[in-house]
Amino acid sequence: MAPNHLSVREMREDEKPLVLEMLKAGVKDTENRVALHALTRPPALLLLAAASSGLRFILASFALALLLPVFLAVAAVKLGLRARWGSLPPPGGLGGPWVAVRGSGDVCGVLALAPGANVGDGARVTRLSVSRWHRRRGVGRRLLAFAEARARAWAGSMGEPRARLVVPVAVAAWGVAGLLEACGYQAEGGWGCMGYMLVREFSKDL
C-alpha cells in the first residue's frame, strides 16, 4: 500500500490506547484557549472578583484568595472538556469509532458518531480528532467525508425525513470551524455559560 494512502476503518481493540491518547491530546490543544475565552467574559470576571473578595475574609493570603477561584474555574472548564471529548465513546447506533489510517497502519485520526436526540435531528459527530503530526494533510477532511456518507446511509436505513450531520466545535478551534465552513456547514447555535458561547454547533443537510 502506498505510504500516503489514506483510508478509514473501524477501530481495532488493540488501538484503543493510541486512540485515547489522541483524543486527550486533541482536547489539551484547545482547553487552555477555551478556558481563557470563558474566564475573560465580563460575567465570569465579576464572579471571580466576588469570590476573591469573599475568600480574603477566610484566607490569610491575599495572593491565594486571588488565585484560588481562577484555578478552580480553569480546572472545572478543563475537566468538563476532557469528560466530553477526551474519552472513548460507548458503541452507538452508527457503529464505530473509526480511525483514519495512512499507509499500512499509521493511525492518524479518529471519528465517532451518534444519532441525534430527536427524529429529524440527523447524526452528530461526538469525537473528531487528528494527530498533531498529521494535521493540514487532508485527514480531517477525509474523516468528515466519511461521516457524511455514514450519516446519509443511516438516515436512509432508518427512514429519517432528511440526512443531516451536526458537528460541535469548541469556540477556540478556529481550524476546525474553517474546515467546516469550507465544506458547506453553517453555525447554528451551541452551548456555553452565562450567555457566552463555548461550543458552537455546525450543521449541514446532506
UniProtKB/Swiss-Prot annotation:
It comes from Mus musculus (Mouse). Belongs to the camello family. Its EC number is 2.3.1.-. The keyword Signal does not apply. SUPFAM superfamilies: Acyl-CoA N-acyltransferases (Nat). The chain crosses the membrane at residues 57-77. It is a single-pass membrane protein. GO terms for cellular component: membrane. It is an enzyme of class 2 (transferase). Coiled coil: none annotated. It comes from the Eukaryota. It is found in: Membrane. This is Probable N-acetyltransferase 14. One of its GO terms (molecular function) is N-acetyltransferase activity. Residues 6-206 form the N-acetyltransferase domain. Keywords: Activator, Acyltransferase, DNA-binding, Membrane, Transcription, Transcription regulation, Transferase, Transmembrane, Transmembrane helix.
